[in-house]
Amino acid sequence: MATKKAGGSTRNGRDSEAKRLGVKRFGGESVLAGSIIVRQRGTKFHAGNNVGMGRDHTLFATADGKVKFEVKGEKSRKYVSIVTE
């Protein structure tokens, strides 16, 4: 008769699914209105001209144009804008 001691149990083995956050359209890229530019938690990037912010802080284009990233203000905040042609 084969004998094998019971393995016991573990309290590890869980991990959450990746949320696919980050910049989706980079500086200089052309976008259409409604395109997602940045998926983020909190406001790492702020909405500039022609950019809207969703309730989960997702930044999206509100007009067609090119993406522009810039650092502005006293607090050196990062803004994302859309420059229309």
Swiss-Prot record:
Going by the UniProt record, its keywords in alphabetical order are: Ribonucleoprotein, Ribosomal protein
Q: Pfam families in the record, alphabetically? A: Ribosomal_L27
> Looking at the record, which segments are called Disordered?
1-20
- Claim: Acyltransferase is one of the keywords in the record: no
The answer to whether keyword Chaperone applies is no
The UniProt entry's GO biological process terms, in alphabetical order, are:
translation
MF terms from GO for this chain are: structural constituent of ribosome
Instruction: Offer a single GO CC term for the protein.
Output: cytosolic large ribosomal subunit
Assigned protein family: Belongs to the bacterial ribosomal protein bL27 family.
What is this protein's name? Large ribosomal subunit protein bL27
List the source organism.
Haemophilus influenzae (strain PittEE)
